[in-house]
Amino acid sequence: MAKKIKTARAIEANAGIQQKFKKKLLTFSRAFSTEIVKAILLDLADNGLLAQDRSLTNPKNPQDKRTLQEISKMVLAKWSRNPEFFKDHVEQFIAQHLGSWIAKATPQARKIAEWVARSTAADVTASQRQAYVAAGLPLDFMAEKWTVPVVRQRISQKAADELPSIIEWSTNLITKMAVNDVQRLQDVIVSTLADGKNITSMRKLLGVTSGFDADRARRVAIDQTNKIANGILRANDFSLGITEGIWVHVPGRFSSRETHKAMNGKRFDLAKGMFDPAVNRFVSCAELPFCRCVYRPALNFSQLLKTK
């Protein structure tokens, strides 16, 4: 009879961090979109009627509302004279300024990425430590290996070394998601003018057709935190000498990968991952898009404590 493998419990990303991350993503995306729409509309009006500190996207006082009506008439008049030229002008304006918009947005995206990476690293490490103590590993065993301070916790040097690349990866994804919404903004502006509607209608349509909606932000938040969590957990495990795990399939919200269902309960090399025939390569937990799978670390006490 095969000897039963001793394991610690699997660790999942923190739902509270995922929720906060979702809100940060929505706030960032909406602010980015608002700035771009304002810049486009100001350009369409030749900056002649609106001061830079007034809001075209959300006018509050009577003066701004009157100015908006005047600009609406001006923009529609220009559009009616030469729609194709006007459309090309919008496209060229976006192409010319997209780089500067990205440069302006990137520091805020990086700030969010740093927060989610460090918060997730600290949270999963705390849970990981508790799981190992409950499984019977001495607390000082982790204390000797996890020495780098991160948000009131200490993680392994290997995990700390991976944080910069995690932050860079997350920053790029956050920025890219906002940039991908620029095409939607352009399409709404052009189609609204083509239909002869005013800027007030345009603002309403932009709000209704929000590209980065709450559900998409939730999916992105879950996916990114799962990937970050599993990366940190593996790095911490490697520092302890833990090299194998038991795959735990976590069902998706609407569906599950059949190959990952088949992986459930199987032992695998943490460094190598497990072979997934659906993609014809080895994968780690949470590596594929929207995969929520985790693992239970396999514990060989005699081997681990021998290297202590």
Which residues make up each language-model segment?
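N-terminal leader/targeting and assembly helices and adjacent pre-domain segments
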Residues: 1-212, 299-308
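Acidic, glycine-rich two-metal-ion catalytic cores of nucleic acid-processing enzymes
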Residues: 211-308
